[in-house]
Amino acid sequence: MPFTNHDGAVLWLTGLPAAGKTTLAQNLHRLLEDVGATSIILDGDELRKARTVPLGYTKEDRDEAVHGAGLEAMQKALDGAIVIVAMVSPFRDARRAVRLRVKDAGFHFIEVFLDTPIEICIERDPKGLYGKALNGELSNMTGINDPYEAPEKPEVIIGWEHSPHSAARYLMEWINPLVRESTSQQVNKSIER
């Protein structure tokens, strides 16, 4: 896996709702902190809440949410952070557009697909959204009455059978060259100041 000497990186965690994206992001963030790397989590739900103009759940709204998250991730990566985006981002074309923008800006982009079967997501259902969608109380629910387009060639696939901690450790090993680069650049920036 070739890494060049650019600041920052974007790890884009995608998967069905309740696939484990936020939990993996939190576990990975802790591991990165433990080795002195600067990381920031951008959670799709939190980003939606923070918007001044709320978005709905049409394809256009979802694509706009992905676009906005991508722009914010690039802004954070400018400071040399490893930005972990945990977001359903159900449409390939929107993820592909963010990938191209991030790479064109000179940052690493690593798509991580949490391959969790919908049956497991329905069992987890921490917000009760699958239950509402299955009862006809909620429309536009990704995986039930709205599509989720799995990545065709993600850099990393995490299977649902892994614990959040083991999945984070696996991902940490995979991005280790980037972590070394990030912490080295942080030391160099400190010396320059």
Describe each PLM feature range.
Residues 8-12, 38, 82-84:
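Residue-level preference for the first positions of well-ordered beta-strands
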